[in-house]
Amino acid sequence: MDAMTSPSPYIELDRTQWRTLRKSMPQVLTEDELEQLRGIGDEIDLEEVSEVYLPLSRLIFLRVEAHRRLNAATETFLGEAMPQIPYIIGVCGSVAVGKSTTARVLQVLLQRWETNPRVDLVTTDGFLLPTAELERRKLMHRKGFPESYDQAELLSFITKVKSGTQKVQAPVYSHEAYDRIPDQTITVDRPDILIVEGLNVLQTGPTLMVSDLFDFSVYVDARREDIEDWYIDRFLRLKNTAFKDPEAHFHHFANFSDEEATVVAREIWQTVNLPNLMENILPTRVRASLVLRKGPDHLVQKVRMRKI
């Protein structure tokens, strides 16, 4: 692994090198279970789980164990027991890159460690400002950009979880309604591990940010041309499935031809998602603990892991 001695904060491993680091981590997923976790257009299969995600699961296991030893050292120093501090993992990347699938697969793999940790998953979609508020602020065209989130609410949520607060509530988002679901929340009650998945979770700022509270982070990466293709493909699939629901926010696209829908999807990508990727998401890649680099087939080709 020559990359370990290169002048870079990252170790770069190709897939062949990375898969050997799985060691004895057992395969704990079935094809039926993976089907339930797979996102629209994502090509992840059991081989991908074995060669990419099981080594990652092993790495996180080792990091969590080190985290616990560090907490024990703090208790020894203070001479008193400390409340359990959840290990928080951020998962970041562009729209359509497959970060949601990555987060869901990781959640299941981590839950099935021999130590049986409680692993919760929260997406930052629930912390988007309600549609009515976005319209009031004239930000609907900026949905997904940092300013479209209730950053204070998100930071408060993560801070409470990190400090060991019981039964912390997180808002819930509906992709069908394209809005928060009023009066509906999920409860996060002192998990061993919390996975936070979202577009902008690695953002930095002049004051405390969500990313400052992460113990580990994963950035799902790919060429922007590939992500554009995946976004358009996903849009076409949704046109023929979820958009057909009369209650769906994008129902008006359901009767578009594939050619018409492709034009719409490409315009949305080029005017909203690509600028957000280039201005806000991609610049945070350097802050990730680990980068999963995908090829055109949606499968991971190489991994970059921070040395420090």
Curated annotation (Swiss-Prot):
Its EC number is 2.7.1.33. Keywords: ATP-binding, Coenzyme A biosynthesis, Cytoplasm, Kinase, Nucleotide-binding, Transferase. One of its GO terms (molecular function) is ATP binding. This is Pantothenate kinase. HAMAP family: Pantothen_kinase_1. It is found in: Cytoplasm. It catalyses: (R)-pantothenate + ATP = (R)-4'-phosphopantothenate + ADP + H(+). It is an enzyme of class 2 (transferase). GO terms for cellular component: cytoplasm. ATP binds at residues 93-100. Coiled coil: none annotated. It comes from the Bacteria. It comes from Corynebacterium jeikeium (strain K411). Pathway: Cofactor biosynthesis; coenzyme A biosynthesis; CoA from (R)-pantothenate: step 1/5. Belongs to the prokaryotic pantothenate kinase family. InterPro entries: P-loop_NTPase, PanK, PRK/URK. Gene3D superfamilies: P-loop containing nucleotide triphosphate hydrolases (3.40.50.300). GO terms for biological process: coenzyme A biosynthetic process.
